[in-house]
Amino acid sequence: MDKIFVDEAVSELHTIQDMLRWAVSRFSAANIWYGHGTDNPWDEAVQLVLPSLYLPLDIPEDMRTARLTSSEKHRIVERVIRRINERIPVAYLTNKAWFCGHEFYVDERVLVPRSPIGELINNHFAGLISQQPKYILDMCTGSGCIAIACAYAFPDAEVDAVDISPDALAVAEHNIEEHGLIHHVTPIRSDLFRDLPKVQYDLIVTNPPYVDAEDMSDLPNEYRHEPELGLASGTDGLKLTRRILGNAPDYLSDDGVLICEVGNSMVHLMEQYPDVPFTWLEFDNGGDGVFMLTKAQLLAAREHFNIYKD
């Protein structure tokens, strides 16, 4: 978009609604990729325009006719242009993302929250756990969104948020503090289970890197802005998942449960381990590639994964 185009937008667009409509039109024409919390140009525009004005997403309808200052319009137009030209996810432009109804700070040190596990958390893992968990582990926590959402869902639980990346943990720590959960959620740096004490968790939730080599080579440009450490996991996408399966039973209580997301790599997991009784979970709000295993099932499958123990 050249300067004339920008000047036209700033001079002829006046209200929040004008900016929303213009952003939707620009996004639709640019054929950008959605997948970082939205799946359509309208939601993408809302999540860019309103946070750029320091407004909540659910402003009253009549507020959309509010007029904007020149500096506000320039800020929005600049971000729309960067979203299109540089293919930067909106969450990195606004430093805001939402998960389980909660707002989180994000930047390019962490993945943008989007896991279908959020639906399970909102439902308090109904039908998957036998009792309220007292100790929860969020492995590969990234921004800390899963750990923090679990702390809200289970306010009496202690939650450990583990990641190998100090950059990611810095973001997680910021979010933990912003949500006032420093006494409930503990950030821990560890290479998966390697540096963890042998705590017996009632629930281990993990959204590890799981993108296989083929998919990594073909990712839309938007995903190139995310840390590769949070995406790639070997040729078949299961490098880290195997280690998790090998170590998880030692860290689960007797009635403990592992919930793990592997995305498209579920195909490789089912092909390679047909005898393991993965329970593949279904979602009302879209998403797949998330399985559940109990401690007993993990112990029974140990012959497959013992080689990957730390």
Curated annotation (Swiss-Prot):
Q: Which HAMAP family match?
A: L3_methyltr_PrmB
Q: Which Pfam families does this one have? A: MTS
Q: Which PANTHER family match?
A: 50S RIBOSOMAL PROTEIN L3 GLUTAMINE METHYLTRANSFERASE, RIBOSOMAL PROTEIN UL3 GLUTAMINE METHYLTRANSFERASE
The entry's cellular-component GO terms read: cytosol
Reaction it catalyzes: L-glutaminyl-[ribosomal protein uL3] + S-adenosyl-L-methionine = N(5)-methyl-L-glutaminyl-[ribosomal protein uL3] + S-adenosyl-L-homocysteine + H(+)
**Broad EC category:** transferase
Its function, per the record, reads: Specifically methylates large ribosomal subunit protein uL3 on 'Gln-150'.
Q: Which family, according to UniProt? A: Belongs to the protein N5-glutamine methyltransferase family. PrmB subfamily.
Q: Does the keyword NAD apply?
A: no
As recorded in UniProt, its EC number(s) are 2.1.1.298
Which keywords belong to this entry? Answer: Methyltransferase, S-adenosyl-L-methionine, Transferase
Superkingdom in the source lineage: Bacteria
Transmembrane stretches, by residue range? none
Q: What molecular functions are annotated in GO for this chain?
A: nucleic acid binding; protein-glutamine N-methyltransferase activity
Q: Which gene encodes it?
A: prmB
Q: Which GO biological process categories is it annotated with?
A: methylation
Q: Which SUPFAM superfamilies match?
A: S-adenosyl-L-methionine-dependent methyltransferases (SSF53335)
This chain belongs to which protein, by name? Ribosomal protein uL3 glutamine methyltransferase
